[in-house]
Amino acid sequence: KLAAMIRCDTTSYANVYDPERFERFHAQLEQLFPLVHEKLERTVIDGNLLFCWKGKAHDRPIVLMSHQDVVPAEGTWSHAPFSGDIADGKVWGRGASDTKASLMAFFQAVEELLAAGYEPANDVYLSSSCTEEWAGDGAPKLVAELKRRGVRPFLVCDEGGGIITEPIGGIPGNFAMVGVFEKGKADVKFTARSNGGHASAPMANSPIARLSAFVTDVEKHDPFRRKFLPEVSAMFARLAPYAPFGLRLVMGNLWLFQPLMKLVLPRVSAQAGAMLHTTIAFTMQKGSDACNVIP
């Protein structure tokens, strides 16, 4: 089923809505999960999906979220990005992990529970945005619909961790990483200006030089303080028994080794280090439209 979902190209682009692309995907979902579509109340809002599974009570509803769109498939692939190939014990393709796998998982879970005649104790909502990859208005529209219905979720499960190998350098094995908190996000645009000019007579300290110096300085001197939140400390405590002796000693005694971990962890694992502080990543840049013009 996951392979079939991957074969439906649901690439999304900022501020561009292709209804036919997502209508094809919705038709595929209906074929794959007929009971979900027969028994649950379905609402479609500009390609965004909301299913309501009525439970015995309505005071503590849960929301299961997973977006249906994927980012453009660029670069080279060992398997075609929308092939849905099953090889080497894996399903390959764009969206296999981000995040049609979780979308498939909760649809399949509900499908099997419906087949078994199960009735949930409380209402369950299945929510899927088609604009997540570019921070579009899909999720806000679904939230607005829940508010309109007077739904106040007791629990929301969104895209988070997965079953990963070696979550931190030196700890082998497969671990199910359940996310219990989420970072915020801000996009900041930095602009350097000048009077412009021609590359044959460049001025000193050009906009590109200034921005390059700024980027280099920020990456060398991280302005954000590192700290261990309680949830992060608890994760290390849970992982400690599976670590080699030296690492187990450190992770099991964070009250003593926190200063050392703050220094070393980002060098050992970028992903683990990101749990300790606000991160900065420079991702897009634009200058002159011609190679011989100074912006």
Residue ranges and their predicted role:
Residues 1-99, 113-122:
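Acidic/His- and Gly-rich active-site-bordering loop/insert found
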